Each structure stands twice: as structure tokens, then as C-alpha cells.
Amino acid sequence: MKDLLNLLKSQGQVTEFDKIRIALAPPDLIRSWSFGEVKKPETINYRTFKPERDGLFCARIFGPIKDYECLCGKYKRLKHRGVICEKCGVEVTLSKVRRERMGHIELASPTAHIWFLKSLPSRIGLMLDMTLRDIERVLYFESFVVTEPGMTTLERGQLLTDEEYFDAMEEFGDEFEAKMGAEAVQQLLMELDLVEEIKILREEVESTNSDTKLKKLSKRLKLMEAFKDSGNAPEWMVLTVLPVLPPDLRPLVPLDGGRFATSDLNDLYRRVINRNNRLKRLLDLSAPDIIVRNEKRMLQESVDALLDNGRRGRAITGSNKRPLKSLADMIKGKQGRFRQNLLGKRVDYSGRSVIVVGPTLKLHECGLPKKMALELFKPFIFAKLEGRGLATTIKAAKKMVERETAEVWDILAEVIREHPVMLNRAPTLHRLGIQAFEPVLIEGKAIQLHPLVCAAFNADFDGDQMAVHVPLTLEAQLEARALMMSTNNILSPANGEPIIGPTQDVVLGLYYISRDRVNAQGEGHVFADTKEVMRALGNKQVHIHARVKVRVHEVVKDLEGNVEERTFIADTTPGRCKLWDIVPAGLGFDMVNQNMTKKAISKLLNTCYRILGTKETCIFADQLMYLGFREATLSGSSIGVEDMVIPDAKYTMIDAAEEEVREIEEQFASGLVTRGERYNKVVDIWARTNDQIAKAMMENLRVEVVKNRDGKDEEQGSFNSIFMMADSGARGSAAQIRQLAGMRGLMAKPDGSIIETPITSNFREGLNVLQYFISTHGARKGLADTALKTANSGYLTRRLVDVAQDLVVNHIDCGTEEGLLMTPLIEGGDVVEPLRERVLGRVVARDVMNPLNQDEVAVEAGTLLDEVWVAQLETMGVDEVLVRSPITCATRWGVCATCYGRDLARGHQVNVGEAVGVIAAQSIGEPGTQLTMRTFHIGGAASRASAVSSIQIKHGGKVRFHNAKHVQHKDGLVIVSRSADLAVADELGRERERYKLPYGATVTVNEGDEVSGGQVVATWDPHTHPIIAEVEGKVQFGDMEEGITVNHQTDELTGLTNIEMLSSQNRPSAGKDMRPVIRVLDSKGKPIVMPNTDMPAQYFLPGGALCGLKDGANIGVGDVIARIPQESSKTRDITGGLPRVADLFEARNPKEAAILAEKTGTVSFGKETKGKVRLVITPDNSDDNYEELIPKWRQLNVFEGERVEKGEVVSDGPLNPHDILRLKGESELARYIVNEVQEVYRLQGVKINDKHIETIIRQMLRKVEILEVGESHFIKGEQAEYARVMEEIDRLKAEDKMLPQYQRLLLGITKASLATESFISAASFQETTRVLTEAAVTGKEDDLRGLKENVVVGRLIPAGTGYAYHMERRRQRADARGPEAPTMDEVEAALSEALSSSGE
């Protein structure tokens, strides 16, 4: 019998579903949901508190107020279940049906649904091909619309004002029909013949040529097709029946004092019902048209307000002038249903408290206050107490726990043994913000946290709080232990380096004992082993810093597992021996025989993890921490004012600087330098002085001179506390010490400009009032910045997570050969990121050949490059590797494990089911708070330093050129190509330096030459842009007429004459169409042809160019024909930090972006139009020219007759990512975005693996634009999901049909999130109304593929351990296309049978 009850219960709720579909509800469906019509606006009788009949809370419609009890009290209790009381009409059942039973209101006149009217683009407008204004005028009864033109001159859908309507009535009588209001719109929608309309539209799309028209038509066509395919009828966008929300979801609560607290929805419903009833009455009375019309308009407005208040006109406000919260407001925004209740829920079995440090804990433990544990583990304690027979009932057990008897504590200790708890610190910016620990019961009320996990939580002990959560089920405990335990999260998922490295005190302690001191007690002693050292230390026979010799036995293991043992005598100190004692076997002694700075310790831990694995590393990290804390305490390091040693040279330096400044002031006074130059020079002087003082100060702090054993002076590392803290990396930096003991330096004004008088004193000397005041700007700005930064960074993370949330590893290998070409990142003379770091943990896409022997395969395709492989690549001198990447992965939904490569947090190939999208988003978003918010103004030193005019080699090696076209000249090679690079390779052929070569640079070395460090290999003039002759001969001027197209100028100093071209606006009208040109002729006076082409050598000179030649002069190859002065380019602000990252991921078009060549070919200039230059590119083999208009003020880098490659820069500026994708393809785009994002993070010293950024880029490239339809079902110009297009192409290939043509689109992360296939995911992100409207109209189905959708519907997510569950369900679904679930009839039959048998 009990089972049957459960069966009945479960029949009501559908739990097994595979998709969710959203569509328009037809009136009949709304009526079928409803349990009765709400006819009265009354809610509750204020005296009896009982709901009014037929009102908004009517018990007959919505169900009883008390469980199993009708309203009048005739039927009570369970035995009358299901009876309908004949007196009050209430069904006897559970009161919770008031949460699920709906009612309805029959509207006296149809009403348009505001979402489909006002949510842009207006769906009703698109369907009827009318503008929103026109439809609104019809709906709100301002004009008539013709619904049936009959045999008249009027057209269907034409608007008529009152006068026009009466005129038409007089003219045509009853021939035509025109109406107003929603009825008219409904009728027009009803009469649409979708099939016919679609046919007409498709023909129009084919025939149209204008782009705007095509856009409009395809929008309409798409909507029509959506209606046709989804089974929605257009007239359902106009409501005739309004559903009423169940009353318990819009409660009315009596407060004391006879007042009621009510949900706003009740007010809105009351309005609708009042107006509806009034309208019914007016219609019954057949009131005058104008009154009825007004009432209908008011009804329309009240329904609008109920659905989405404030969307049209002024929002309806309540008694307190606050707009009422409508149905739409309930679901959107941070406080709406999606984000407040579905994506984030509060959790049971949790608590929070302040955290304090727990230096005695092991890495996997946390201290949990007994009081908290008792509360959190209550059910487990009750069960144990009952099981032991200590309590007879749960109630008794509860009493015992409240009394806190001794047995309870014993049982608590048993219960929590090996039961992990999860600790979380808000804000949880990455997955390491929640980790599992085994609780250790402690007295007190604060949670104890292990110091080494603070970095992962970003926690400190200045009052931070943390939350504790208890995993209840066995599975949850298992996952917490296997996946979330702090000992399993040693590496950071962002970059694969240890995140549990020691910091602060621990670093200081370890650094202190690893230092050595001259002439310390026991110097020069020799010890047999480290144990002997320890004894000597204990007996105070030797100082911890003494330089001694010790016999060391080490066992070294390498990455491949080979073990090597050796014993030797090492020069070391007792302190380092102490450290060596806790180092696990397998690591070499040289790793600890050095000053243990933070970097060295981190490296030690990393090596330990890679060679010895997790367990050893955890034990070692704990030991390091205990040792570090102990030794830091014993060292007695502290800070005193005396430690801030001010260098003696400071005051002389400041005097010298002031002298220089005085000189510049005098020059300014006598007019030799401009105001701007003076300012820049002064700022430069002070910046330089500051650096010099800082240098002197650090030198002063770094070393101290002491007497050695022989009584001579010897330098040793200083034991100054402040210096030690900074040097070890424990706390502080050179910049901070500079402010304490050097000079504070230059300060900025609130607007960001630098104040030219610096603060010359430091904190030890103290600041005077003016200096203090100047300092306050920066301090305030810093605080305001931090607050803004946190919000911005959080929003960026949210957008990233949203765009990448459905990206999960779902295949082992997709089998593609595509990939990205990885090269070392070289900027100027420095290798910023060597190849080994870039390819570590990636899979090789194609065989890598050995550079020393081209036939030998060095690494086979499909190899996962680990540390061993990477080292081999480096020794072979491999310079570039094609590796698999998430961007080029061919998996349809998700990515494959091979393209992703190594799971950074685990160090092996990524598992299937790993949510790599979310990990990528967190890795990029989490350091967001460390980025700066400001945009850098270029000023002072920066703007002048940028005028580089030569290349000086740093290290030396072999010269290589890249894309360099050059001609031979007497001074050397002259570069005549745009994007040339000069690289220097080392003896293994690996590039170590790389420099840009501008057009016109003179290079003094050849390809393959050996150069040495410090050699200058190229020079150029940074202030002019030359035009270089590529042939030799005689010069002939064309169209150069004095005063018309050119002016002669003579330089007073040198006496040389230059010819200056006049720009077209400065010429007299005679010269408007003339084009100054220099041709090169041979000795016979014939034009010379350019090498390798059939084009004559002629150089057109733009306005402003200066030419120093005379007509008829001889020129040689590589000579300068003319120079174009570069106006110092407008100083652009460099956007840095967080805003830059956001711009890149949002794929925003930069202002004044660089102009790229759209085709490969030859450049010429066509006819100029007003203010614009016409650039023409003629491809070599075809004659379809490409033309583009470019504003005159843009400086062009190309000359007439020059060849450009597709995608080459024609005019400088910031690059536009959309152009890169269109002209150079995905891999070039990926390289650009990855490098730009990395540059921002690198400046802040944040390491993020490239693959995270690539993962996000993959999601930004999800959409394609259809260029040609082929025989597919797409529409020309529509944006479709890339995976869908590939599926369609597979289908068409199989059927041997014409394939569609498409081009990849780059969408910004916000756009991409909203354009996802899943409407649940998009609606819970932003613009909920728009997303839901669109989804409903198109009858969208959500396949519940991503993580977000599954969280919203309350399922396990299809990632991690939930992935298996989803795969299993998918398999079952495929099997179970067979028998159906039992119908209601079968259930009833079974029920009656069971009842009859139990009745016997």
C-alpha cells in the first residue's frame, strides 16, 4: 500500500527528461493547466483570514490551506483524501498543491504580450512587416489598421487615423474592414500564410543586391521559418487567456496590527482583474465606443505591467513610490530566480568562523572547533548514540548532545575520524578556493588553517573568515578525499607549478640558516656526516653559519627514474646540513647548498614533486615549514630604524640633480627649450637620480666588511634584517626599501601626470607637510583603484566562465593534424619565454625532425612532451614545434584530451570529463585583481626612448633575416620590405634575439655572418620615412612644377637645396590633378623595369616628401630618392592591465586600427575623394581590383607600385583581431591574442599557461557566417554554430550534395555567451528577457549539454564524476527507445486491484 502512495506521488512530477523545450503557450494549453478561473480581485477576508471565493487566493481553485482539511471544516484528516467538499468546493489534499496549481483569467479582449512586442527586434513587428511605432499605435488605440481590404484601394496592414477611417467609410462603405487594438493585430497574425510568405521571402533573398535589404529579409525569413518549424502559431503572441501564478508563490502574510505584507504580483493581478471585469460590464452594457476603447487600452497596459513592469511607459509604483516587481523582474538580474536560487543555493551542514594559523598541523589537516563539529556532525552522532544503545530514541540522543555529556565527545571524535570537511574562503576565484581537510578537534572558537595552503586560498589571518561544509554521502566523502584534499592540490591549475610553497616567516627562517658567515665559531672544521654536525651544533661547538666541510652521501634520482649514489666532501654550513636532514632521498645536495631564497625553495619543491611524487612532497613541505618557523623564531630577525641605512652619497647626488634642474630652468627662461621639453627633462633627471640613490643604497645594504681568520678585511653578505627579508623574498622589495632609506621619488597628481618636484626625503628622515600632502594623492587613488579593480576583475571572470562553461574533455583523440606553431618568445635581445616552457605538456601534431640531420625523426607525432622530451628538444636545438591546440581540435562538442595535453594540476594527460573551460576561465580571471587598472600615458622618458635608431646585438651568434627584401648599397644592405626581422641564433641554431628592421634601414652584416655582443648591425633615421631606389640610372622628374606641385627650400646652415612636394590641399587649382613622380631611365633615356617584374621604375611622391636630387642626376641601387618626415606620431595611450585583457577577450575593434592589405598584389592610388585616399590593390594574375578609401590623415606605409602580401600592414595602428582572423586565419589570430594577453600578465609577474587562453579563444570562434548556402538548410548571411555546420557538411557529403561556404567569426566573450545553443545558460547570464523571448518564438530545445544548464535543472554536471553518469544515461536512452513508461490508466488498474485485495 505504501509503495502505491509513493507511486501516486511520483506520477505528478516528471523527473526523467533529456531536453527542455520552451515555446509559446496556446490558450487551450493555459486553460488545461488551470484549476479554475479567477473572477474577483479579492484576496483574503480581513476578519476571518480565509480566502475569498473565486478570488486570487480561492481555496476551491488552488487547493486547501491546511493539509487534508477543507475550508469549511466538514472533511478533515487523511481518510477523506481526494474528496471534494460539496459545501465549499475544496478538494481535501495536501496544502502544498497551492504551490503548483495555477488559475487563469479569461480576458474580455485580446492583449499583446509585451515581450514579443517591445523586446528588440519586435517579433510581432517582424512578422507583420510593420514598424514598432505603427503596431503600438494600433495596440494602444491611436489608429485603425486595415485587416480586410476587400475590393478597395486600401492595403492590408495599412494604418488609418480617425479622419482617414471615416473618409474611407464614406467612400467604400462596408467593402473593407479596419480595426484597432490587439484584436486587429491578432487577426493579422492569424491570417499570415507562413508557407507562402517563406516562399516569397526566399525568392526575394535570392534576387536582392543591397546588403541592408538582405539583412532585413533574412531576419524576417529566419523568424518565419522558426515559427513554421517550431509549431508555434504567430497569433499566440497575443494573449486571450492569462495564467495566474499559484498563490503560495505570491504569498500574502498577515502582520500583527491588522496589516498585510504582500507580493507585488498580487497588486498587479488585482489591477488586471479589476479592469477586465469592468470591460466585461461595459461590453454587456454596449457602452459608447470611446469608453470601451479606453478600458481596453487600460487592460493592455495592466497586462504589460504584470508581465514586465516599466518596459513600456512609466512603471506602475506601489504605495512607497517603488516600482512593483513584475513577473519578468522575478527571473532576471542578480536577485532573480536564475542567479539567486538556481545557480547559487545556500547549503545545509555548513558553518563559518574566523581563521587562525595552525603551524603544528599536517598539510591535510585543519583545526575544527569542538562546538562547530558537534553541530555539523549531529545526525552522525545521533545515529552512533542510538546504535551503541546509549540513547533509546533520537529525542533522547538530542538531549544528550545538548547536555554535552562525556560520551558525546568520545563519539564525536569517532565520527569525524577520516571524515573530511571542505573549507571555502570567499571570494572563491579558482578551484583551489575550496579544499578538503581532515578535521582535528580543538578548543576555542576559531578554525585553524595550515599556513602552506594560504596562498591557494589567498587567506591571511587579519580577521578572514572561512566556511566549513560537510560532505554527507559516501560518494561525496570519496570525492572530497580523492580530488579535493589539500595534499592532492599541490600544483596550480593555472601554470602547473607548486602552489603550496612556503612564504614569509618560513622563507626567512630557511634563508637565515642557509646563509654563511665569515670567521664564525668553528670555521674550517671537518665533519664525518651530518649527524656529527648536529651534535656539534647542540653542544654549541660550531655556529650555524660557520663555513665547514662535511662528508655527504647523496642518492640522486632523475626524471626517468635512474638512481645514482655518490659520497663526497662538500663545503657547506651547519645550517644547510640541518636542511639537508629533512630533504627526501632522491634530491641532490647542491639543491640545498646555496642561499635558500623563495625561488630556490619553490624550485626544490617542484623538483621533488616531479621526481618523487605527491606523498614525499607533502611530507617534505610540512617538514620545511616546521623547520622554517622554528629557525625564524630562533634567528631573532626584526626591524629597527637603524636597519634602514641611508647611503652617504645620497645628498651629493641630490645636490647634483638640483644643479642640473637649475640649468634647464635657465635654458627655458632664455627660450632655448620649450615648456614640454623642460618638464620632460626635469622628470627624467629626477627619475635617474632616484635610481642612482636606490642603487647606492642597495649596494650599501647588500655587503658588509668583516675581519676574517687572518685579520684581513673580507666582504660578506649583509645580515641586515631588512635586506634579508627582501633578498630572501619573504617580504618587501627593493622599491619599498628605497622609500624607507633612499628617496621616495616622483609622485603623481590625481589626473595621473607626474609632479616634477620629487619627494627627496625618505620615511626614515620623515616627510614635511608639502611632501606628505603630495603623497596623499597616490594613496587615495590606490584605495579607490583596488575597489574598482575587484569588481571589474570579478565581472571578467564571470564572463569568461560563462563563455567556457560547456567545454569539457569528451574524447581521447580527435585525430587532427592541425595545430599551432610554437616558437620561443623573443623580444629584442631577451628570450622572454623559451620553447621548452611553451611546449611542455603539449602533444606534438606532426613529426619533429632533428635539425642536425633532416631525415631523422626526433619526436614522433602524438608524443606528449614531458620534462625529459623538452630537455632533448633543447639539446638538439629545435626552434619550432607544431603542437596540438584546443583551437584546432576537431571534436564537435568539447575538446579531446590529445589536443589539450597535460592536466597542469596533476602532471599527466588530462582525463576525459575534465571541465577544462571552467579551469581556463578561473586561471585567467583569478589573477585579475593583481592587474593594474590604469591606462599608461606616454610621457617623459617613454616617448623619447621609443625613437630607436639602431640595433645593437646583446649576446652574439649567427645572423638570420626573416621576410627581408634588400638591395646592395655602398654602405651595406638596404632593407626594402615592410615586415623584416633580424634574428641572432646561437651555436645550436636556436634563435636567442630578434629585432624589427624598418623599411630603409642600412644593415652592415649578411645572412649567416657571425656577430659578437655589443656590435651595431643596423642603423636608420627614426624621424623620416625614406623612399629607396631599387634600380640604378638617371632621374627624370615628372609633374614637378615650382609653386604648383613643389617648392624649393634652401637650408640656411648647410646651403643644400631640397624640393618639397605640396600636399593637394596646398596646391593652386592648376596642380590639383598633377602627381609628382620620379622615373629612373637608362643611358638611352628609356624607362628601366623593376627587377623580376614588367613595371617601369617610377616613384610617386606624396605630399610633404622632401627630395634632395636634381633632375637628371645619377642614382645607384639603395640610394634614397626622397624622404617623408614622420610627424611625431600622436601619442596614443597604451591601455594596460585589466581593461586591455577585457578588450582582447571582448574582441573590440580598436580606435584607428591598423589597415591591412585585403589581397596580395600591387598597390596604386586611384582618384581621391574628399578627405580620403583611394587605395587600389591589383592581384598579380587576375584583374578584380580591391579598392578601399582611407582617410588622408592616416600615414600610409606603402608607395605606388609596391607589392604587398595579404594581411600586411598598410597603415600603422593597433591591430584589429577580426581583420587578423579574416586575412590570416585562426592560428595567426590565436598567436596574436595569446601573446597580447600574456604580455599584460607577464608585466605583473603572473604565469598562466597558453592553453587556457587558447581554450577561451576556441569558444570565441564557435560561430561561422554562411556565405553561400549550397544545398544546406542555412540562410545566406546567418550566424550558425560551427559544430552544427560541420554536422550538416558531413550529412551533405554523404548525400553528395553541394556544400555551404562559410567564414569563421570572432565573437567577444559576452556575445559568445549569449549566442550559445543553450537558452538556459544564456538566460542565466545576461539580458534574460531577450534570450527567453527569442528562445520561445523559435521553440528552442536545450539539450542540457553544458554545466550551467544541468546545475539549473538540478542534475549532476556532465563533467568530472558526473560525466560517467551522463554517458550512462545517454547509453540507456539509446537502448530504451523500446517499452514506454506506464500510463495513468495502467496505474489506476493496478491501484484498484491492490485496494480490492487488501480490503479482503
Curated annotation (Swiss-Prot):
Database matches in InterPro entries: DNA-dir_RpoC_beta_prime, DNA-dir_RpoC_beta_prime_bact, RNA_pol_asu, RNA_pol_N, RNA_pol_Rpb1_1, RNA_pol_Rpb1_3, RNA_pol_Rpb1_3_sf, RNA_pol_Rpb1_4
Residues that coordinate or bind Zn(2+) 1: 70, 72, 85, 88
Cofactor binding notes: Binds 1 Mg(2+) ion per subunit. Binds 2 Zn(2+) ions per subunit.
SUPFAM superfamilies, sorted: beta and beta-prime subunits of DNA dependent RNA-polymerase
Gene Ontology annotations for the cellular component aspect, listed alphabetically: DNA-directed RNA polymerase complex
The reaction(s) this protein catalyses: RNA(n) + a ribonucleoside 5'-triphosphate = RNA(n+1) + diphosphate
EC number: 2.7.7.6
Binding site for Mg(2+): 460, 462, 464
Cysteine pairs bridged by disulfides in the record: none
Binding site for Zn(2+) 2: 814, 889, 896, 899
Pfam (any one): RNA_pol_Rpb1_4
Source taxon at top rank: Bacteria
Amino-acid biosynthesis as UniProt keyword: no
Keywords of the record: DNA-directed RNA polymerase, Magnesium, Metal-binding, Nucleotidyltransferase, Transcription, Transferase, Zinc
Cofactor(s) listed in the protein's UniProt record: Mg(2+); Zn(2+)
Family: Belongs to the RNA polymerase beta' chain family.
Subunit: The RNAP catalytic core consists of 2 alpha, 1 beta, 1 beta' and 1 omega subunit. When a sigma factor is associated with the core the holoenzyme is formed, which can initiate transcription.
Protein name: DNA-directed RNA polymerase subunit beta'
